[in-house]
UniProtKB/Swiss-Prot annotation:
InterPro entries: AB_hydrolase_3 (IPR013094), AB_hydrolase_fold (IPR029058), Carboxylest/Gibb_receptor (IPR050466)
Region (Disordered): 26-52, 132-161
Keywords: Hydrolase, Serine esterase
Protein name in UniProt: Probable carboxylesterase 11
Tissue: Expressed in roots, leaves, stems, flowers and siliques.
UniProt-listed Enzyme Commission number(s): 3.1.1.1
UniProt xrefs under PANTHER family: ARYLACETAMIDE DEACETYLASE (PTHR23024), CARBOXYLESTERASE 11-RELATED (PTHR23024:SF639)
Function statement: Carboxylesterase acting on esters with varying acyl chain length.
Pfam assignment, any one: Abhydrolase_3
Enzyme class per UniProt: hydrolase
Residue window of motif Involved in the stabilization of the negatively charged intermediate by the formation of the oxyanion hole: 173-175
Listed GO MF terms: carboxylesterase activity
Hydrolase as UniProt keyword: yes
Length: 460
């Protein structure tokens, strides 16, 4: 059984959640509450500021990718992306030049898991001055102290010739459609953990919340980010091609290259972290709670559009305690309807806020993954890892979905965690528990099967 602390926190959590849901329902009755631009976080949410330095092994930055909506992403770039192609040395960027750190046994600096603790504190102290000088744009080797007009974050080398390419993970946070955010303290911690364990670039998606934006806004936002990732890859390739092209008498000027890119793709900027370090042909989707429903939607849309997404390829997805429901209750829905943190009545309220009133049904295609007529056929779905908790009333439907995938020969294992509750690996209070740590390691072990073997991954 969960600990006494978890039980007490669950009571407090459910009280606050019920109060917030009721307030949202009251406000949703006012037509003025509809906002096409949308919101991606709530005032009560504790957020973590982005940090473009590798202070704990992962650098982060926020990008607003759609001028018409509030859709945004937070990029989590692990320090392992700076490892040069030569395995004998590791690279740091110092005053715009590459310097090497030799004779570091076991490459402790780049250890993903050790960087969660403080075992590297002495070494990190020695290189802190170098990390603070990442990406100075003034051209000077030591900008004035206290200068506020100088970017001190990581900036890849303009040549990009020695860049290491990492797979990409699109992460969709939970929160019952109406709360949560990609930059919350809890989600920031979880994404940093996944970036280190999986050795992967994480894009945490800040999708629009309900009731200001109802279905399919959040799901479409998820797919829009996948298309944006493909556009970034094409922009980077175009930039590289134009930069390498020559004309009689000299090289093409950078300004002229940028003009050609703008003419071809519109006024979109190439994201340097992704251009230098991302391999979109190895893309994993990971969704937490209702975010798992978004991940499943994005996977289905990716199958429908097929090669139009090139070079992006979804090679696997991870569904963490998905927010599935249906009109016919399962065994766990009957026995554990009043379980910890998210009980069934409150989740139904959340679905009423998310689905348009005229479309509300517990068998809506966004709610029930096993309704007849849902496309595409399950046999085309990517390998799917499902994480479930013992004390979660949504468990049985997630397991049933996984069983249907296995019937059509999709690799779809289920990992069930004993004495665990919904969001046991992502909720703020539970993030540092042994179960949460073990879950992250299990996800990394499974995901690496599909992101490490080039040429053997799933493709549509």
């Amino acid at each position: 059984m969960p600990s006494v602390g978890v039980k007490l926190y669950s009571v407090f959590f459910k009280f606050l959640l019920k109060h917030r849901l009721q307030n949202r329902i009251q406000s949703s009755g006012d037509e003025s509450s509809s906002d096409p631009f949308g919101v991606t976080t709530r005032p009560e949410e504790s957020v973590a500021a982005p940090n473009p330095l590798f202070t704990d092994g992962v650098a982060t930055k926020d990008i607003h990718i759609d001028p018409l909506t509030s859709l945004s992403v937070r990029i989590f770039l692990p320090e392992s992306a700076l490892t040069p192609l030569e395995p004998s040395t590791s690279a740091c960027v110092y005053s715009g030049k590459a310097r090497t750190l030799n004779n570091i046994a076991g490459s402790d600096l780049l250890s993903r898991r050790n960087s969660l603790g403080s075992s590297n504190s002495l070494l990190s102290h020695k290189v802190e001055s170098r990390r603070n000088s990442y990406g100075y744009t003034t051209g000077s080797s030591s900008p004035e102290a206290g200068s506020s007009d100088v970017y001190r974050g990581y900036a890849p080398s303009s040549s990009g010739g020695n860049s290491r390419k990492l797979p990409v993970m699109l992460q969709f946070h939970g929160g019952g459609w109406v709360s949560g955010s990609n930059d919350s303290v809890a989600n920031d911690f979880f994404c940093r953990r996944m970036a280190k364990h999986c050795d992967i670039i994480v894009l945490a998606v800040g999708y629009r919340l309900a009731p200001e934006n109802r279905y399919p806004a959040a799901c479409e936002d998820g797919f829009k980010v996948l298309k944006w990732l493909g556009k970034q890859a094409n922009l980077a390739e175009c930039n590289k091609s134009m930069g390498n092209s020559r004309r009689p008498g000299g090289e093409v000027k950078k300004s002229e290259v940028n003009k050609h890119i703008v003419d071809a793709f519109g006024a979109s900027l190439v994201e340097p972290w992704l251009a230098n370090h991302a391999d979109p042909s190895r893309c994993v989707l990971l969704g937490v709670s209702c975010g798992a429903n978004i991940a499943d939607y994005v996977a289905r849309k990716a199958i429908e559009v097929g090669q139009n997404l090139d070079p992006v390829k979804v090679v696997a997805q991870v569904l963490m305690y998905p927010f599935f429901i249906g009109s016919v209750p399962t065994q766990s829905e009957i026995k554990q309807a009043n379980s910890y943190f998210y009980d069934k009545p409150m989740c139904i309220l959340a679905w009423k806020l998310f689905l348009p009133e005229e479309e509300f049904s517990l068998d809506h295609q966004a709610a029930n993954p096993l309704v007849p007529g849902r496309s595409p056929p399950l046999k085309f779905m990517p390998p799917t890892l499902t994480i479930v908790a013992e004390h979660d009333w949504m468990r049985d439907r997630a397991i049933a979905y996984s069983e249907e995938l296995r019937k059509v020969n999709v690799d779809a294992p289920v990992l069930e965690y004993k004495d665990a509750v919904h969001e046991f690996a992502t909720l703020d209070m539970l993030l540092r528990t042994p179960q949460a740590q073990a879950c992250a390691e299990d996800i990394a072990i499974w995901a690496k099967k599909y992101i490490s073997l080039r040429g053997h991954e799933f493709s549509y």
